[in-house]
């Protein structure tokens, strides 16, 4: 699935200077492309408020990032849990009306989550970097900044806001982009979870030989439907490679019940990223216990 970058000039001038119409190539072809295109605008707006240089200065006084990989590897719960804080999504709208990031973070840590993922995209997921900052103050767990990262600026902003790890999505980044952004994260001692959706993307990532956390997203980017077959089919082919290269495979999305969890555990999945299953329930603790302790 090809995700194009936003055209530099999304309109075509018509007759007088004050008239313009959208160019046909300036229309996003799917929701993921729309999100990525909006990131260009969002990043420019962020830079007007805080420069990259100012972010770098702030990082100098921060404590070292927490070890995301180690927390999943040494988790008492198997597979390790990356519990997500997410208010809304493009496909479901508002998922959790009673949304208190501080209370959710404290709850997750008390239940034994290995790490916490925080949505920071505002327009499509109603997240923010302010939420990430709130969660940082509320828990000692490693935090993943869950965003659609296309720029080094976002990585520095995530670090300043309290993130220990970032998400890179193979579908929206070239190999050169992936290598460059990974180097930025490495320089900041941050962990990187790289996300794939199919075998072509996974092959790309393995050839780069740069990542030890690979997330297999079970969500179809065209339909936004989830199917655990994505994780199962890829693990059937690549489990041995992951093991030999000390790569932790993480299954993301569509994990709804204890049976799903057992299926993933049995094929060698080392971590699971779960958000909506917890967010849609009024009692997160009950939902968590039902998922991990009912077998």
Curated annotation (Swiss-Prot):
Enzyme class: lyase
Catalytic activity: 1-(2-carboxyphenylamino)-1-deoxy-D-ribulose 5-phosphate + H(+) = (1S,2R)-1-C-(indol-3-yl)glycerol 3-phosphate + CO2 + H2O
Pathway annotation: Amino-acid biosynthesis; L-tryptophan biosynthesis; L-tryptophan from chorismate: step 4/5
Gene Ontology MF terms: indole-3-glycerol-phosphate synthase activity; phosphoribosylanthranilate isomerase activity
Pfam family, one: IGPS
InterPro entries: Aldolase_TIM (IPR013785), Indole-3-glycerol_P_synth (IPR045186), Indole-3-glycerol_P_synth_dom (IPR013798), Indole-3-GlycerolPSynthase_CS (IPR001468), RibuloseP-bd_barrel (IPR011060)
Keyword annotations: Amino-acid biosynthesis, Aromatic amino acid biosynthesis, Decarboxylase, Lyase, Tryptophan biosynthesis
Highest taxon, organism lineage: Bacteria
GO biological process, one term: L-tryptophan biosynthetic process
EC number: 4.1.1.48
Lyase is among the record's keywords: yes
Family membership: Belongs to the TrpC family.
Annotated protein name in UniProt: Indole-3-glycerol phosphate synthase
Source organism (scientific name): Prochlorococcus marinus (strain MIT 9215)
């Amino acid at each position: 699935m090809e995700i194009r970058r936003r055209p530099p000039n999304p309109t075509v001038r018509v007759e007088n200077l004050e008239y313009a119409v959208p160019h046909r190539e300036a229309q996003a072809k799917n929701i993921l492309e729309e999100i990525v295109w909006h990131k260009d605008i969002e990043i420019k707006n962020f830079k007007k408020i805080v420069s990259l240089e100012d972010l770098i200065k702030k990082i100098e006084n921060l404590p070292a990032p927490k070890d995301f990989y180690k927390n999943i590897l040494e988790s008492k719960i198997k597979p390790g849990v990356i519990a997500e804080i997410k208010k809304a999504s493009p496909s479901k709208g508002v998922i959790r009306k009673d949304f208190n990031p501080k209370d959710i973070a404290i709850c997750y840590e008390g239940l034994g989550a290995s790490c916490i993922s925080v949505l920071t995209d505002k327009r499509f997921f109603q997240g923010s970097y302010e939420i990430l900052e709130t969660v940082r103050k509320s828990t000692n767990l490693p935090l993943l900044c869950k965003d659609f990262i296309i720029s080094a600026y976002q990585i520095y902003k995530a670090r300043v806001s309290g993130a220990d790890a970032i998400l890179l999505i193979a579908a929206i980044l070239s190999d050169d982009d992936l290598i460059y952004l990974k180097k930025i994260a490495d320089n900041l001692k941050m962990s990187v979870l790289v996300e794939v959706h199919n075998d072509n993307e996974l092959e790309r990532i393995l050839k780069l030989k740069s990542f030890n956390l690979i997330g297999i997203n079970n969500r179809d980017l065209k339909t936004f439907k989830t199917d655990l077959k994505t994780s199962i089919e890829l693990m059937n082919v690549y489990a041995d490679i992951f093991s030999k290269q000390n790569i932790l495979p993480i299954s993301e999305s569509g994990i709804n019940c204890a049976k799903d969890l057992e299926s993933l555990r049995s094929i060698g999945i080392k971590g699971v990223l779960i958000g909506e299953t917890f967010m849609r329930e009024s009692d997160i603790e009950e939902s968590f216990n039902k998922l991990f302790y009912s077998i």
